């Protein structure tokens, strides 16, 4: 079976994380005196990754990077997360909140805080250039336009809800 290209590392500060390959996925971890963060990322198929996150710290000072064609859906299962973006906007998520948005603008760069020092969440990352190739193989060219579907949530804006 062909290995599925990982795109999650293209938007993360890998120098801050330890990385290890496990069966069917990758674990990214950060251990500091202030706490821990762990992400278990699974490639679903080309251009789509599902990531489970668990954090037990107040803040992660990182510089998430934009990636043209990247769309994400986030779900906060437990705890709380706050992302302060370079454009001055702030995203707050509490338990059972969902957010969607494009991660392709330079203003996507952000830092992250966890006011309760605890967070569990899931995110679905869709890298449109690769995912569209896979969808085209399954259902035929031009049958489904992933960017158009994602824009129904964000209407070409950076953030949906």
Which residues does each predicted region cover?
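N-terminal low-complexity or simple alpha-helical regulatory segments
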Residues: 1-68, 74
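Ser/Thr- (and often Asn-) enriched beta-sheet segments in non-cytosolic proteins
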Residues: 29, 38, 84, 90-92
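Short, acidic Gly/Pro/Ser/Thr-rich loop/turn segments
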Residues: 60, 82, 131-133
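Alpha-helical bundle regulatory/interaction domains
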Residues: 94-161
């Amino acid at each position: 079976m062909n290995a599925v290209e990982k795109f999650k590392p293209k938007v993360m500060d890998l120098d801050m994380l330890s990385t290890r390959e496990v069966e069917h996925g990758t674990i990214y971890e950060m251990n500091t005196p202030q706490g821990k963060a762990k992400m278990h990322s699974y490639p679903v198929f080309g251009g789509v990754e599902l990531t489970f996150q668990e954090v037990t710290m107040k803040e992660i000072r990182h510089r998430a990077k934009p990636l043209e064609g990247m769309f994400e859906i986030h779900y906060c299962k437990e705890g709380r997360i706050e992302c302060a973006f370079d454009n001055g906007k702030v995203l707050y998520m509490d338990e059972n909140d969902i957010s969607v948005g494009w991660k392709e603008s330079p203003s996507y760069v952000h830092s992250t805080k966890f006011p309760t020092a605890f967070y569990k969440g899931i995110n679905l990352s869709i890298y449109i250039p690769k995912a569209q190739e896979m969808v085209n193989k399954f259902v035929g060219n031009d049958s489904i336009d992933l960017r158009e579907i994602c824009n129904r949530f964000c209407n070409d804006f950076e953030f949906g809800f």
